[in-house]
Amino acid sequence: MTRGLLGAAALLALAGGAAAQVDTTARDTTARHDTTAHRDTTPAYLPAFAAARPEGPLPRGTRYAFPADSFAFSNAQTLADLLAHIPGVYVARGGMYGQAEVVLYGGRGPAGVEVYWDGVPYLPLGRDSVYLDLGRISLAPLERVDVLVLPATLRIYLVTARQQSTATASQVRIATGQARTANYRGSYERRWRSGLGLSLVADYNNNDGVSGSSSTPFNSVDLWLKAEYLPTPKVGVSYQIASSSWKRSPSDQPGLTDHFAYKRRDGIFRLFAGAREDGLGPRLDVAFVTTSASADTAVTGRSLSQGALALGNRWGHGHVGVTLRSQDEDRPWQLEGSAAWIPLRPLTLAADARRARYSNSRNGERLHLAAGLALPLGLTARGDVAWAHDLQAPALASDTAQRTTDISGALRWDRHRITVEVGLARRDSFVPLGHPAGLRPLGGLGPTQATRYLTVHAAFEPLPGVHFSGWYFDPSVSSGNDFEPQYHARVSATFYSKFWRVYKSGIFALRGEIAMDSWSRGTAGLDTTGNVLALPGATFMEVNVEVQIAGVTIFWIQRNMNGMRGGYVPGLDYPRRYQFYGVRWLFTN
């Protein structure tokens, strides 16, 4: 009782003291609020459009992936340079940078290459509505290139930059070299926390060519702009504009290089809606594309539009999808389907099919099946079957469907520092149509024989930072097919190190590479009068050195360093010891 009274008295005393200390001063309502508080500038990583590339799972070794470092920190200057790393690819170059670069694969002419820009077919348009000049597709807006290799076809998926961080990123590149080569490139990428994004890339190239050769003066301007809005990972919308304009001057000697002025503009609208934030489950994709080609005095301007509606479903061990496309009058509609599945852990199955309707009541079908099996000791076996009864150039009214069945298989061995793959394939005969407009002496390709061929691909790292890689291609026919000489190989040796013991922060990197592309004698199609062109054997070497310090990269590249007299196409020579060098700056925030 006494303790309770004492406690109550103590509380009353404290309360009285506190009341005596109450501040009775009137509040100053004119005082300004503290504005020194900083807003949250910590970068946030936001959702982005899923990369439009082949849906997996796929058998190991069927896909080649080239991330941004593959063409930003390497000797690749064009898309064709990247594809030269794939066994069996022949790049028919009209000369130095700026001249035509036509990728030939599988003896199928224009049907050997399919290109998709963010999942949308990139169709040839303009003076050449059959072949794509891959040297004129700028790498500047791209963050990734995936290539799905079929027995006689390359499906190339180009993925544009997808900025996810709210930290603003920008890049500047300046390069110069022989023939008054000049390259200026700039990019700016920004994402806001609301989900809004803006990306801009500008790329300017110019050179004065080499007098008296097929390497004539060239100038190009590539612009790319993309705006996107992804309020949640489940839904998003984007619109991008890709504009490319270039001019190639005629050669001093008639019949080598024609005057070629060209401007292409693509507008791509995309929308997606998914059921889950992790990208699994049902998903809807919609795309609408407009493309125009102009500025060429040799042909009238032309435009086309495309629409696509895709429905798919992904889960942990597979996917299934169907796409309906409506394209130009030459391709009224296409229905595509794809599926992949891992029924058992060592087994992977994949398939895709297409049914197409073309102008003049023509139809086309194709089917591709693939399987892969993981074996002990790091071995993997895979096989592909591609059947088609399809057109190769729907823009040509004379094109008719050709029936082909192509089969390939490979055995791959992967260890920690070594990869070896040996493949065999059989392709049906084929008659390519048309001729590349940028390769003036080439009047077309001759018929391709039914061919069996051997490919070998290997990569080896004997020491940390030291890499050897290469491939070998051998068609088992006595004379070879056009641009498929009996022996063709590419090898390279690369040194790459960040010198961690000296630069512990990782601020420094050094890369050096020497590569060689060599082939034996063969045939190179037909000239403009129908006579067979002989392809001389040749060896071209190149060297690349790059030094990276933080966000600055200094590079030097020399092509045809061994001074080879000749070229990749008969009659079109390649400059000897052509070199260019420059610097790239990468800024963040």
Residue ranges and their predicted role:
Residues 52, 79-82, 101-104, 116, ...:
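N-terminal periplasmic accessory domains that precede
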Residues 59-60, 143-144, 151, 160-181, ...:
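Transmembrane beta-strand segments of Gram-negative outer membrane beta-barrel proteins
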Residues 42-56, 63, 80-121, 159:
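Extracytoplasmic beta-strand/coil segments of soluble accessory domains associated
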Residues 22-74, 162-166:
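N-terminal periplasmic "start-of-domain" segments of outer-membrane beta-barrel proteins
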Residues 120-149:
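Short acidic/polar hinge/loop motifs at secondary-structure boundaries
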Residues 152-156, 163-223, 235:
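Outer-membrane beta-barrel translocator/receptor signature
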Residues 213-214, 232-283, 287-308, 328-331, ...:
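Flexible loop and strand-edge segments within Gram-negative outer membrane beta-barrel domains
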Residues 283-291, 300-589:
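Exposed, low-structure sequence patches enriched in small/polar residues
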